């Protein structure tokens, strides 16, 4: 049974995608300032970060994620970690064409866009399993 956590306040926030600004620590710092001004105490992260979390097949980088989460926590901001399956990395589409979605007219979609994947692809399912471990 899942542990129930009770808070004495509402969790308030939204999606946060800091991976697009990793080369700009000044922006990441400013984000936290803005969050505090808006009384944001919770962010969800990771939903579109797969390409940064696994830049090459089998090579994972979670250091940046840990740093961002720690910096948020120091400022009283909680993190809800999402699965990064919203946008898979380009290397996957290049190497495994079968992970790309096929439309009803049997046209295979090109890489790009969110949720453009074939949910029944065994390769896609394996890669999702691996990144979520």
Segments predicted by a language model, with ranges:
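An acidic-aromatic substrate-binding cleft motif
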Residues: 1-25, 34-41
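The substrate-binding groove and active-site-proximal loops of carbohydrate-active enzymes
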Residues: 12-23, 48-64, 110-130
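Aromatic-lined substrate-binding rim segments of carbohydrate-active enzymes
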Residues: 28-109, 129
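Generic structural motif recognizing short loop/turn segments at the entrances and edges of beta-strands
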Residues: 1, 10-12, 96-98, 106, ...
């Amino acid at each position: 049974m899942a542990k129930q956590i009770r808070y004495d306040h509402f969790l308030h926030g939204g999606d946060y995608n800091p991976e697009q600004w990793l080369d700009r620590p000044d922006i990441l710092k400013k984000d936290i300032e803005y969050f505090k001004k808006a009384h944001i105490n919770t962010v969800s992260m990771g939903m579109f970060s797969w390409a940064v979390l696994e830049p090459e097949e089998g090579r994972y980088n979670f250091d940046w994620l840990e740093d961002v989460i720690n910096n948020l926590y120091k400022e009283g901001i909680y993190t809800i970690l999402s699965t990064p399956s919203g946008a898979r990395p380009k290397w996957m589409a290049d190497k495994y064409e079968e992970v790309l979605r096929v439309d009803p007219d049997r046209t295979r979609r090109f890489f790009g866009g969110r949720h453009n994947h074939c949910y029944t692809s065994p390769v896609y399912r394996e890669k999702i399993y691996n990144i979520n471990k």
